[in-house]
Amino acid sequence: MTSVVSSARRTIRIGSRKSQLALVQTYWVREQLQNSFPDINFEVHTMSTQGDKILDVALAKIGDKGLFTKELEVGMINEEIDFAVHSLKDLPTNLPEGLALAAITERENPADALVVHENFKDKQIDTLPAGAVIGTSSLRRLAQLRNQFPHLTFKDVRGNLNTRLAKLDAGEYDGLILAAAGLQRLGMGDRVHQILPKEISLHAVGQGALGIECRADDAELITVLKAIEHPETRDRCLAERSFLRSLEGGCQVPIGVNTEINGNELILTGVVASVDGQNLVKDTVSGNASDAEAIGIRLAELLREQGAQEILNTIFAEIQRGS
């Protein structure tokens, strides 16, 4: 591809978290860009985020505004790095002033996956015995699974994927609910025991996609980053992020989605659930994919009419109390 970067700019600095998964994702993005722009030197710079440092507290109790992104965003604003690679599900829907979501890469499988201890290899999520201990750090997964499987025991789990799997194999848990995409990217796809269908668990907003963030005024760099954008994934994720933004939810609240595109039609399903799983509202809206953000807003309004705001208000109050 013909270079669109000025001759004075031959090095572009990429910001990444230090986790194994983050680095795998960042180096994948670097490889795609290097293939398209061989004359540019793409350097990876790593940073630790708040979410990487606090591993003994449930995510929902920390607060989630930029938990895995803030330090990278400060680095961009201070021009220490030029762009950052995020798991899109971790990127807040309202970005800091001066930053932009420049590109969204093609999505991996966005579904949640069940990984089980060897004692339960013959079970599925709906056949696990009463009292089986399932690990998840996500209120979204917790709420939906409690709604359908109240006989299971759910326990918080933190740490990187290897740490979580080690805890599972040591018998601390009977099963884990993890993002299928993360397991696949780390070459651990063989650990997936069951892909949870959307009827059981709607995935997180942006799950399975990578979001590339940079300074909004860096038009030259944005042109470079657009080379690895996947338009269909962007439409789907813009609808999902608009839905989440309209509900004023964050990355850690029990809000799940599913998007499908048939021709020009985008179909968005969303759910809002109470943490105990007792209250759950769910519906679907469709429209032209070119109106992705409007579809998200319409779905948020529809769920509000069905009681979603009351559910969210209760959750926010519980989080503030630290319960």
Curated annotation (Swiss-Prot):
NCBIfam families hit by this protein: hemC (TIGR00212)
Catalytic activity: 4 porphobilinogen + H2O = hydroxymethylbilane + 4 NH4(+)
Listed pathway(s): Porphyrin-containing compound metabolism; protoporphyrin-IX biosynthesis; coproporphyrinogen-III from 5-aminolevulinate: step 2/4; Porphyrin-containing compound metabolism; chlorophyll biosynthesis
GO annotation (BP), single: protoporphyrinogen IX biosynthetic process
Listed name of the protein: Porphobilinogen deaminase
Coiled coil: none
Family annotation (CDD domains): PBP2_HuPBGD_like (cd13645)
S-(dipyrrolylmethanemethyl)cysteine modified-residue sites: 251
Family statement drawn from the similarity comment of this UniProt entry: Belongs to the HMBS family.
Organism: Nostoc sp. (strain PCC 7120 / SAG 25.82 / UTEX 2576)
Example GO molecular function: hydroxymethylbilane synthase activity
Alphabetized PANTHER family for the sequence: PORPHOBILINOGEN DEAMINASE (PTHR11557:SF0)
Other observations noted: The porphobilinogen subunits are added to the dipyrromethane group.
Taxonomic lineage from the root: Bacteria, Bacillati, Cyanobacteriota, Cyanophyceae, Nostocales
